[in-house]
Amino acid sequence: MQIYGDLRRLWEKAKIKESAKKPEITGLCRLIKGYKIMIKVLFICHGNICRSPMAEFIFKDMVNNRGLGDQFYIASAATSTEEIWNGIGNPVYPPAKRELAKHGISCEGKRAVQLKKSDYDKYDYLIGMEERNRRNMLRILGKDPEKKVSLLLDYADEHGDIADPWYTGNFDITYRDVVRGCEGFLTYLEGKGQIIMN
């Protein structure tokens, strides 16, 4: 996976203006010497059983429905180990799973995993749900020299935190906010010329 990020960074540094005008080259799903370059996104929350898996599967559904699935590698993780026992993560919290299912989205097989320092090099975007997540992400990752760390609603019209439905019980509101953030993130990527919208 690292080769994808390395090649993409080399490509961007080259800044070939003529090529940037060609849609088959502009999109992130380009071929450079036989390597397919994908944008790698990691969504992060406290336990990886509610908000971040909702974001993972909502965003997967969103890009797949737009025919963009092959341009992305998408996953999610936790800043804590509270939902991980003896190395095995808990599945998505049932109310979160039901909320996704209401919208025709499956999260089957997903289990909580913890964010690792090495994820900084593996992923292009590490996206938290609230300011506390960001602080804990930086505690695990260290510094953020490449400005990869952000919050999901940074990409939406209204910024702020996505409330934890574990405490609020409002999984419908969390779903709405995650969709809003994911749509904004996709628009942001399109604006940067990192993807080709079909």
Language model region names:
Residues 1-10, 26:
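Intrinsically disordered, low-complexity proline-rich regions
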Residues 8-15, 32-122, 187-198:
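Conserved active-site segments centered on acidic
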Residues 11, 20, 119, 125, ...:
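Phosphate-binding/catalytic loops
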